[in-house]
Amino acid sequence: MTTALCWQTEGQGSDLVLIHGWGMNGAVWQQLLPLLTPFYRVHWVDMPGYGHSHDISADSIEEMAQLLLDKSPISATWLGWSLGGLVATQAALLAPERVTRLVTVASSPRFAAEGTWRGIQPQVLDDFRRQLGDDFQLTVERFLALQAMGSPTARQDIKLLKQAVLSRPQPNPEALSIGLRLLADVDLRAQLGDITQPWLRLYGRLDGLVPAKVAKDMDQLAPQSCRQIFAAASHAPFISHPEEFVQTLKDFIK
């Protein structure tokens, strides 16, 4: 049984940590790596319960962040996509001296809609959790389709995301269930003012999971951060617009 998270490292330059989202694994960054490794020493991980970290579990966002901090560079820019953005944000709060810059991609401090807060309807997350017990592979595929919905290149986006999922061991069903619970329950909004590192928030205007209007709400909660919205992207702008995505990242890390 594996007892340590699966990390991979490539490239040279300042350290950059990449954290994937729910249902995925570190292979999701594959097409981005040739654009990043000439400029950064890139570290990407299979999160607890995913890919080659299949046998490792973490029950809370704090535990996930700490597991990553335990084996990550002494200081680095952390980039987290979707659920990975929640983990990166938690790491930035736990260890600001280690997470020197924060980049959140198609992410939110509170994924579930609540009152006037925009997000995923709780019923949708409940349905996904119920479906997991029946056919978790189909549930992951439905989530992939949701992530690409709205993108002009949706079919190609889904193909690339699916290739990443299938290239490594399937996710642990328990980790998938825990991840959906975290997406439904975690709320970091009250702590965002404590983030003092440079922070870039990236969104897709066509995102059906994290509505682009959340960007404006976040301007109020985290005025110390900056943000960019990719006009023709959905939930995975680094898949649909890799060159534009990397250029935005390079401009921020300068």
UniProtKB/Swiss-Prot annotation:
The keyword Repeat does not apply. Its EC number is 3.1.1.85. GO terms for biological process: biotin biosynthetic process. Pathway: Cofactor biosynthesis; biotin biosynthesis. The active site is at S82 (nucleophile), D207, H235. Pfam families: Abhydrolase_1. Residues 16-242 form the AB hydrolase-1 domain. It catalyses: 6-carboxyhexanoyl-[ACP] methyl ester + H2O = 6-carboxyhexanoyl-[ACP] + methanol + H(+). Signal peptide: none annotated. Substrate binds at W22, S82, L83, F143, L144, A145, L146, Q147, H235. It comes from the Bacteria. Its main location: cytoplasm. GO terms for cellular component: cytoplasm. Keywords: Biotin biosynthesis, Cytoplasm, Hydrolase, Serine esterase. It is found in: Cytoplasm. The keyword Zinc-finger does not apply. GO terms for molecular function: pimelyl-[acyl-carrier protein] methyl ester esterase activity. Monomer. The physiological role of BioH is to remove the methyl group introduced by BioC when the pimeloyl moiety is complete. It allows to synthesize pimeloyl-ACP via the fatty acid synthetic pathway through the hydrolysis of the ester bonds of pimeloyl-ACP esters. Belongs to the AB hydrolase superfamily. Carboxylesterase BioH family. This is Pimeloyl-[acyl-carrier protein] methyl ester esterase. It comes from Photobacterium profundum (strain SS9). The lineage of its organism: Bacteria, Pseudomonadati, Pseudomonadota, Gammaproteobacteria, Vibrionales. The gene is bioH.
